[in-house]
């Protein structure tokens, strides 16, 4: 049986922490879709098309990963993709309550959809896209936290 997993998020922008989880998921599952959410309720710095393009560039070395933008409910997107696994990262205990609610709702909407939680590597456990953007906005060096092409795109966007 082929396993297909979806790793969803806004990824505004994709960080090395996200990339670490994605790389690890790509070793666990036959195929992984990095599903980039339109997230109209969030004020994203990058458009959906920009986030998809940046993520495609950062993941081209992962042969079993596809990057796809979506604006549907996650459960509906998973059905469209014939996937039955959601990969989510848990950085801290604070993430758990929200992730548990999401997992329960997604399972209610699609009973065959299972959520699998991965812990970030210690190096990336404190990183979030929001934090990286905030540091960059104030002139801090974020090159350790983002793939090179995304660092350039972020600096350009913040000019």
Swiss-Prot record:
<keyword id="KW-0548">Nucleotidyltransferase</keyword>
<keyword id="KW-0173">Coenzyme A biosynthesis</keyword>
<keyword id="KW-0547">Nucleotide-binding</keyword>
<comment type="pathway">
    <text>Cofactor biosynthesis; coenzyme A biosynthesis; CoA from (R)-pantothenate: step 4/5.</text>
</comment>
<feature type="binding site">
    <location>
        <position position="10"/>
    </location>
    <ligand>
        <name>substrate</name>
    </ligand>
</feature>
<protein>
    <recommendedName>
        <fullName>Phosphopantetheine adenylyltransferase</fullName>
        <ecNumber>2.7.7.3</ecNumber>
    </recommendedName>
</protein>
<keyword id="KW-0808">Transferase</keyword>
<comment type="similarity">
    <text>Belongs to the bacterial CoaD family.</text>
</comment>
<dbReference type="GO" id="GO:0004595">
    <property type="term" value="F:pantetheine-phosphate adenylyltransferase activity"/>
</dbReference>
<comment type="function">
    <text>Reversibly transfers an adenylyl group from ATP to 4'-phosphopantetheine, yielding dephospho-CoA (dPCoA) and pyrophosphate.</text>
</comment>
<feature type="binding site">
    <location>
        <position position="42"/>
    </location>
    <ligand>
        <name>substrate</name>
    </ligand>
</feature>
<keyword id="KW-0460">Magnesium</keyword>
<feature type="binding site">
    <location>
        <position position="74"/>
    </location>
    <ligand>
        <name>substrate</name>
    </ligand>
</feature>
<dbReference type="InterPro" id="IPR001980">
    <property type="entry name" value="PPAT"/>
</dbReference>
<keyword id="KW-0067">ATP-binding</keyword>
<dbReference type="GO" id="GO:0005524">
    <property type="term" value="F:ATP binding"/>
</dbReference>
<feature type="site" description="Transition state stabilizer">
    <location>
        <position position="18"/>
    </location>
</feature>
<feature type="binding site">
    <location>
        <begin position="89"/>
        <end position="91"/>
    </location>
    <ligand>
        <name>ATP</name>
    </ligand>
</feature>
<dbReference type="InterPro" id="IPR004821">
    <property type="entry name" value="Cyt_trans-like"/>
</dbReference>
<feature type="binding site">
    <location>
        <position position="88"/>
    </location>
    <ligand>
        <name>substrate</name>
    </ligand>
</feature>
<feature type="binding site">
    <location>
        <begin position="124"/>
        <end position="130"/>
    </location>
    <ligand>
        <name>ATP</name>
    </ligand>
</feature>
<keyword id="KW-0963">Cytoplasm</keyword>
<dbReference type="GO" id="GO:0015937">
    <property type="term" value="P:coenzyme A biosynthetic process"/>
</dbReference>
<dbReference type="Pfam" id="PF01467">
    <property type="entry name" value="CTP_transf_like"/>
</dbReference>
<dbReference type="GO" id="GO:0005737">
    <property type="term" value="C:cytoplasm"/>
</dbReference>
<feature type="binding site">
    <location>
        <position position="99"/>
    </location>
    <ligand>
        <name>ATP</name>
    </ligand>
</feature>
<dbReference type="InterPro" id="IPR014729">
    <property type="entry name" value="Rossmann-like_a/b/a_fold"/>
</dbReference>
<feature type="binding site">
    <location>
        <begin position="10"/>
        <end position="11"/>
    </location>
    <ligand>
        <name>ATP</name>
    </ligand>
</feature>
<comment type="subunit">
    <text>Homohexamer.</text>
</comment>
<feature type="binding site">
    <location>
        <position position="18"/>
    </location>
    <ligand>
        <name>ATP</name>
    </ligand>
</feature>
